[in-house]
Amino acid sequence: MADAKTIKIEQIGSPIRRHHSQRETLIGLKLNKIGRVTELPDTPAVRGMITKVHHLVRIVDEK
């Protein structure tokens, strides 16, 4: 797993007035404030979560 790919994402939008499931998805991505950056493994599950809230996050870096 030394070669495991990671992805950095940044929250750029607020979850205010968004559906509850989108808020929960942001929490699952370890994001809770605008401007926060988190690094997660690049898996299909994480990619799916990013797709669900693509309007609230941006990909900063892919390794």
From Swiss-Prot:
InterPro entries: Ribo_uL30_ferredoxin-like_sf, Ribosomal_uL30_bac-type, Ribosomal_uL30_ferredoxin-like
One record GO biological process: translation
GO cellular component, one term: cytosolic large ribosomal subunit
Gene3D superfamilies according to UniProt: Ribosomal protein L30, ferredoxin-like fold domain
Keywords associated with the record: Ribonucleoprotein, Ribosomal protein
GO molecular function: structural constituent of ribosome
Name of a matching Pfam family: Ribosomal_L30
Keyword match Ligase: no
PANTHER family: LARGE RIBOSOMAL SUBUNIT PROTEIN UL30M, MITOCHONDRIAL RIBOSOMAL PROTEIN L30
Subunit structure: Part of the 50S ribosomal subunit.
UniProt record similarity statement: Belongs to the universal ribosomal protein uL30 family.
HAMAP family in the record: Ribosomal_uL30_B (MF_01371_B)
Protein name (record): Large ribosomal subunit protein uL30
